[in-house]
Amino acid sequence: MSFDYTDPTFRNYPFPHYCDFDRHQHCDHDLRTNPPPTEPPSRKSKLMSTSENKGKQPLHPPPTEGFPKPPPPPSSTPTTPTPPDQTKAPEPIEKRIIHAFHAEPKTHTNGEAPPAFNPNNMNAVPLNLLNINLKYSPVTNSIANPKQTEAIGKAWVRILQIDPANVFLYAIDLARACADAGSSPEADIIGANEDLNPVVERNALAGVVRDFCPLRAFCAYYSRVVWNLMIKADQPPANWMKSGIDEGAKFAAFDFFHGVLSPASLYVPLERHPTAAERIANQAMFAVKIANAPGNGSELTMDHVAFTKGRITADSKPRPTPFNT
């Protein structure tokens, strides 16, 4: 069986056949009951726009006077003839192809236009994100936020009688000392900065900080400043050798290094960006410290019941922090 693909009445959907109905709206042809004519029509259509013309409609189909259409059923109501100048133009062939092979797009509104954006509606659809008047500041649990640091500064002034004009200097001095000694909950921050007036022990400063947020989160907020101080003075963390980090990555040997590249930390331009070796070394340092952390009197590295089976030993004691060993 062969088909004349250039014939204007040929249709390839849903199966090859000849049909005069537009867009198959009333098409009920079946090859099993109504086989196509064995001889193609003698009238040839115009050439198509491409050489590979199988199964495609011509851009400008020829008139079909030689193929009579069935007469319309008689209507009981009289119809008014349409003037010649008001006759509807035929639908372009490109649009017919799109309608035949592509379904109309549907949305969650079932084709209806989405409503105007209303912030009072939890299901509002913002068509243009630039029109949303919303400002966002990055925040994370591992880094203190500006409100917490402001509250800590006011507490220093109220409790430790610190000069309000120097609260930032005390904060940077404490964070720089924690880069050497660690910022874990059990870390003992020793010493004081003799250049600041009044002279306040860093351990007292850290005690006030822990009432508002973890000391590590506080130091991570100022990590970019601490990083610049170490790079500019060429002074890596004091315990970099103890951490087992290679000399080429020694500046990353502090436990709040994650705040250096975080958008939630206090932004200052960096003297230089951390290298890939420094980032990997810091992650390796964390993994080693956690793996070597002693358990509750056992040799297990985790307290999960799947490992401990609910057992404890007689010599159980508080676990020291991984960065205070």
Swiss-Prot record:
Keywords linked to the UniProt accession: Capsid protein, Helical capsid protein, Ribonucleoprotein, Virion
GO molecular-function terms, A-Z: structural molecule activity
Coiled coil: none
Record-linked InterPro entries: Pltvir_coat
Chain positions covered by the region annotation Disordered: 30-89
UniProt xrefs under Pfam families: Flexi_CP
GO cellular component: helical viral capsid; ribonucleoprotein complex
Localization (cell): Virion
Compositional bias of kind Pro residues: 59-84
Signal peptide feature range: none
Stated family: Belongs to the potexviruses coat protein family.
Function: Required for genome encapsidation. Forms ribonucleoprotein complexes along with TGB1 helicase and viral RNA.
Protein name: Capsid protein
Organism annotation: Indian citrus ringspot virus (isolate Kinnow mandarin/India/K1/1996)
